[in-house]
């Protein structure tokens, strides 16, 4: 029998796990998910690493070595996280080779405290890439307005990028433009475009959570009927933007030079509203050449009972635009929501980074 995760894979969706820890690597758990649930990549973020480090057992030996060498907290965090990502890259190397670098990818985020400093973000992206030193690493850069030049600069150096925290269609267009600009500069720099890969991480459930809260405040029957629809509509329209970008002369010139398209990646796919199906943001966002990164709970639910019926995105654009228009008619501002979500997203990563630093600081102090 074909499993739901295999059906997703057959439909052109790459399944990535939105989690990483040393325990997951050393126990064989990640390899098991690769073997049984069609996992072909991993995404990480500061929140994930903060949770991993909170379970200190797997890191005790390395923390003791770092403490003995009088390593600073920032350097210790850098060493620990890049070591985990390098090991994960090695685990996924066969998949990366089999897919010519499309999958088998492991993402690591630049220090979120640098999100509003383009030059510092670009420098950190280069440092991460050089330190991990694996062709299947993806460097995550937030899609803030100030992050866009960093994306172009990083791609221009031949570094593969995961652009994260995308909430709005307008910002997504800016991300696509930054990727193409980076590829054009990489070509001028004599880089081999076929070795550069990118995904654009478009967040889904957080859009529903915020818009649904505002629809509840409106309280009309029309508003209630629109709940749980904004995230999917927004993501589906993002896929239309992606398709349109591939139809431009600018992209066709780059593709002829060997460039890889920047695939849409659906992030924030864990369902927050218990009244909605737990695989909603998986089964309703099936489209060719996409990635869905899932927390393990969503991955397991998908493997267990998701009903995958093929492409659920292509051809939904008019209907999706009508959903967003109807939400606007209820007095809910799309621009306000996406701006708020970007700000909150950065704040969450900042808080997680501080938590990560605090955890490592305490571990270093205990080992000294």
From Swiss-Prot:
Keyword Nucleotide-binding appears in the UniProt entry: no
EC number(s) of the enzyme? 2.2.1.2
**Major enzyme class:** transferase
Reaction(s) the record says it catalyses: D-sedoheptulose 7-phosphate + D-glyceraldehyde 3-phosphate = D-erythrose 4-phosphate + beta-D-fructose 6-phosphate
A Gene Ontology molecular function term of the record: transaldolase activity
Q: Which SUPFAM superfamilies match?
A: Aldolase
A single BP term in Gene Ontology: carbohydrate metabolic process
Report the subcellular localization. Cytoplasm
Keywords for the protein's UniProt record, in alphabetical order: Cytoplasm, Pentose shunt, Schiff base, Transferase
Q: In which pathway does it act?
A: Carbohydrate degradation; pentose phosphate pathway; D-glyceraldehyde 3-phosphate and beta-D-fructose 6-phosphate from D-ribose 5-phosphate and D-xylulose 5-phosphate (non-oxidative stage): step 2/3
> What is the similarity comment for this entry?
Belongs to the transaldolase family. Type 2 subfamily.
Function according to Swiss-Prot or TrEMBL:
Transaldolase is important for the balance of metabolites in the pentose-phosphate pathway.
Protein's UniProt name: Transaldolase
Organism, per UniProt? Answer: Kocuria rhizophila (strain ATCC 9341 / DSM 348 / NBRC 103217 / DC2201)
């Amino acid at each position: 029998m074909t499993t739901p995760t295999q059906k997703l894979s057959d439909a052109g969706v790459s399944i990535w796990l939105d989690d990483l820890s040393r325990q997951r690597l050393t126990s064989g758990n990640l390899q098991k998910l690769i073997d049984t649930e069609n996992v072909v990549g991993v995404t990480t973020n500061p929140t994930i690493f903060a949770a991993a480090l909170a379970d200190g057992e797997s890191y005790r030996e390395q923390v003791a070595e770092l403490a003995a060498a009088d390593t600073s907290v920032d350097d210790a965090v850098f060493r620990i996280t890049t070591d985990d990502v390098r090991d994960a890259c090695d685990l996924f190397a066969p998949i990366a080779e089999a897919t010519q670098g499309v999958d088998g990818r492991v993402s690591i985020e630049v220090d979120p405290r640098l999100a509003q400093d383009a030059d510092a973000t670009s420098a950190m992206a280069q440092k991460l890439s050089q330190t991990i030193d694996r062709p299947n690493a993806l460097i995550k850069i937030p899609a803030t307005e100030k992050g866009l030049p960093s994306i172009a600069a990083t791609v221009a150096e031949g570094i593969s990028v995961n652009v994260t925290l995308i909430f709005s269609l307008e910002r997504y267009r800016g991300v696509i433009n930054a990727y193409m600009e980076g590829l054009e500069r990489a070509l001028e720099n004599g880089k081999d475009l076929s070795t550069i890969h990118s995904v654009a991480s478009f967040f889904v459930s957080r859009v529903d959570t915020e818009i649904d809260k505002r629809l509840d405040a409106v309280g009309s029957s029309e508003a209630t009927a629109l709940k749980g629809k904004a995230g999917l509509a927004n993501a589906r329209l993002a896929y239309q933007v992606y398709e349109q970008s591939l139809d431009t002369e600018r992209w066709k010139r780059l593709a002829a030079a060997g460039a890889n398209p920047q695939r849409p990646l659906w992030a924030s796919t864990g369902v927050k509203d218990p009244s909605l199906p737990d695989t909603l943001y998986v089964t309703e966002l099936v489209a060719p050449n996409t990635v869905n990164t899932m927390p393990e709970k969503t991955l397991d639910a998908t493997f267990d009972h998701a009903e995958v019926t093929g492409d659920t995105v292509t051809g939904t654009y008019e209907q999706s635009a009508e959903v967003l228009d109807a939400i606007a008619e209820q007095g809910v501002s799309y621009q306000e929501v996406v701006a708020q979500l970007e700000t909150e997203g950065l704040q969450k990563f900042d808080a997680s980074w501080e938590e990560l630093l605090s955890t490592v600081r305490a571990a270093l102090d205990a080992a000294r």
